[in-house]
């Protein structure tokens, strides 16, 4: 079971909660993460199996509970059965229906069974269930923000349900995110452009519309890659001693590259997801701006990779496209080893991100900080989906497009002609469901072959690098 949540801490043990144990028997640990622990349990009143999710961050727990209640009742969204709020010394405990499998188990089982793989009729039923779950969330105004196969749980009889909504947000009925598309507002400054101080690697950034070169008339200072990495080392050293303003780095208007790049350089690039902690969640609550550092890299929309903090359900639709493509290929379509590599992989397939392909992209916080050589001949989605029919490629194209306003909704895709073609989707009871995974199963090693070599740095992924230092920070061009 996928683990969500943020930072914080309480007892870190469900066994010391008589309010919980008096109503639920704790049978054993089912999964564990930095910010949540999940236990198998049984309801004492009727013996029904349950999942007891102990969340070590009250903000994340409340957010998940609110999102689940907003989307209920839905056959394809996990049911929240009970909620035990935490206190000064206890964590929140969410009681959820027990679902022993997830969609990544289906993908792994099908990949192991090659060449028979996943029959088309079964694949269509899995796809329809994913679409129904996402459509239910979106109709309730919920943005999941971390859709991936591991967060799509499956019952033993094959019913798939959207789960792990610890990063979810509920869009307001009025205001920025509801009833007015964030990319279509007509104010002088695009809504995702930060009006407050942002930070790129600890360097203050001016408003994007004020070009430092134009203001000063001076050529920017040129840096070698070694100079750039030396500056990064100095910033890390300052950060260690608390000299970098942590609140600035965690501000809701700071971009994902601004807050995450040094970690990509420093740490294991296979660490696919950015840790969404409690402090970041509280800052979102206070500022009203979303953070761009949500979701898991392989499924993160381009606007998030470029630092957007004002977005809607369209980010889920990009993730949905990646998930459905994985059901076709039985492997991730964009398995980036770092955020920069992720953008590079997407561009190599879909082409250059420009105002023509993504209106308003030049206003994204990091658009003018990371540059790639122009791709003259992108390989296209057809090449990434070999031996697939036109209708199969079409459904992925409707989701994996740069312009968020052109991504098809999950509700629309439920009526896509592809699902009316032969072979028709099998009924749910006709699905071949893998055996339940062991408690200690760790799927990370299953995907180890998708690592980008042995590199542990964004910069090792590219041949040459042109680094420019300006008053805004660093501008990097990769070739």
From Swiss-Prot:
Active site per UniProt: 146 (proton acceptor)
Q: Which GO terms describe its molecular function?
A: ATP binding; cyclin-dependent protein kinase activating kinase activity; cyclin-dependent protein serine/threonine kinase activity; protein serine kinase activity; protein serine/threonine kinase activity; RNA polymerase II CTD heptapeptide repeat kinase activity
User: Does the record carry Kinase as a key word?
Assistant: yes
Q: What class of enzyme is it?
A: transferase
Bias (Basic and acidic residues): 468-479
What does the induction field say?
A: By auxin. Down-regulated by cytokinin.
Q: Which UniProt keywords apply?
A: ATP-binding, Kinase, Nucleotide-binding, Phosphoprotein, Serine/threonine-protein kinase, Transferase
Q: Where is this region: Disordered?
A: 429-479
Q: Which residues carry this modification: Phosphothreonine?
A: 291
| Residues where ATP binds | 30-38, 53
Q: Per its UniProt entry, which superkingdom is the organism in?
A: Eukaryota
Instruction: Output the Gene Ontology cellular-component terms.
Output: nucleus
Q: Which reaction does it catalyse?
A: L-seryl-[protein] + ATP = O-phospho-L-seryl-[protein] + ADP + H(+); L-threonyl-[protein] + ATP = O-phospho-L-threonyl-[protein] + ADP + H(+); [DNA-directed RNA polymerase] + ATP = phospho-[DNA-directed RNA polymerase] + ADP + H(+)
Residue intervals of the Protein kinase domain: 24-419
Question: Which Gene3D superfamilies does UniProt cross-reference here?
Answer: Transferase(Phosphotransferase) domain 1
Name the EC number(s): 2.7.11.22, 2.7.11.23
In which family does this protein belong, per the annotation? Belongs to the protein kinase superfamily. CMGC Ser/Thr protein kinase family. CDC2/CDKX subfamily.
Q: Per its record, how is this protein called by name?
A: Cyclin-dependent kinase F-1
């Amino acid at each position: 079971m996928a683990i969500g949540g943020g930072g914080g801490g309480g007892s870190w043990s469900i066994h010391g909660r008589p309010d919980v144990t008096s109503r639920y028997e704790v049978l054993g640990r089912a999964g564990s993460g930095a910010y949540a622990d999940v236990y198998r349990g049984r309801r004492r009143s009727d013996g029904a199996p349950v999942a007891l999710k102990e969340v070590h961050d009250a903000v994340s727990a409340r957010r998940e509970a609110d999102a689940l209640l907003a989307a209920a009742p839905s056959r394809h969204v996990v049911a929240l059965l009970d909620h035990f709020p935490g206190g000064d010394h206890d964590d929140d405990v969410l009681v959820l229906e027990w679902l022993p499998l997830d969609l990544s188990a289906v993908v792994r089982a099908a990949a192991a069974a090659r060449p028979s793989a996943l029959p088309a009729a079964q694949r269509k039923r899995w796809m329809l269930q994913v679409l129904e779950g996402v459509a239910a969330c979106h109709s309730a105004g919920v943005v999941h923000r971390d859709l991936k196969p591991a967060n799509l749980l499956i019952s033993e009889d094959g019913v798939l349900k959207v789960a792990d909504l610890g990063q979810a947000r509920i869009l307001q009925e009025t205001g920025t995110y509801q009833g007015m598309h964030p990319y279509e507002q007509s104010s002088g400054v695009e809504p995702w452009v930060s009006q407050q101080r942002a930070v790129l690697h600890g360097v203050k950034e001016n408003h994007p519309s004020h070009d430092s070169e134009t203001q000063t008339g001076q050529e920017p200072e040129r840096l070698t890659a070694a100079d750039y990495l030396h500056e990064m080392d100095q910033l890390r050293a300052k950060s260690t001693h608390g000299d970098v303003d942590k609140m600035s780095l965690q501000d809701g208007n700071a971009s994902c590259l601004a807050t995450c790049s040094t970690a990509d350089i420093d740490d294991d690039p296979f660490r696919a997801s950015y840790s969404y902690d409690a402090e970041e969640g509280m800052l979102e609550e206070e500022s009203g701006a979303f953070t761009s550092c949500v979701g898991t890299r392989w499924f993160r929309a381009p606007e998030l990779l470029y630092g957007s903090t004002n977005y809607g359900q369209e980010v889920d639709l990009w993730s949905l496209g990646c998930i459905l493509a994985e059901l076709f290929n039985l492997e991730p379509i964009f398995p980036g080893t770092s955020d920069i590599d992720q953008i590079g992989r997407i561009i190599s397939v879909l082409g250059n991100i420009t105002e023509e392909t993504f209106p308003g992209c030049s206003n994204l916080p990091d658009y003018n900080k990371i540059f790639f050589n122009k791709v003259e001949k992108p390989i296209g989605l057809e090449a990434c989906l070999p031996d697939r029919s036109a209708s199969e490629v079409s459904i992925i194209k409707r989701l994996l497009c740069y312009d968020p306003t052109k991504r098809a909704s999950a509700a629309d895709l439920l009526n896509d002609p592809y699902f009316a073609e032969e072979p028709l989707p099998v009924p749910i009871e006709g699905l071949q469901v893998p055996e339940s995974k062991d408690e200690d199963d760790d799927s990370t090693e299953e995907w180890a072959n998708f690592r980008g070599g042995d590199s542990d740095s964004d910069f090792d992924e590219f041949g040459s690098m042109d680094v420019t230092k300006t008053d805004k920070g660093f501008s990097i061009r990769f070739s």
